[in-house]
Amino acid sequence: MNSTSQSRKWLSLYPKDYLPDLTPEGTNALDHLRKTVQLYSQNPALYYFDKVISYRELDEMSDAFACALKELGINKGDRVALYLQNIPQFIIGQFGIWKVGGIVVPLNPMYREKELTYYFRDASV
């Protein structure tokens, strides 16, 4: 074992076709998604109970959501609230919002009316 694999033991858990150096290329999460779709389109991106969503499926679903947002008039710089639990639709929505240039405003479904009102005003949603 070399010093890198000794200090970064989690690397032994990665699939054999993954590169040990995972230095990010690109500037944002969308760049990383696009690159990952090119390299590993069939690999699992999300696991949710017994459902597995591949990177290709994640990209396609977030494209569809982005198109729906465009049809609703959402444009670059618009803030869009995501009022969802920790479920795949949150990730799909987040990427879809970013694809149209929107700003994601994540909101916890446990927030009460007073808290939601505060965040809606503060974020100009």
Give the positions of each predicted feature.
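A short N-terminal helical cap/helix-turn-helix that marks the beginning
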Residues: 2-8, 22-44, 60, 64
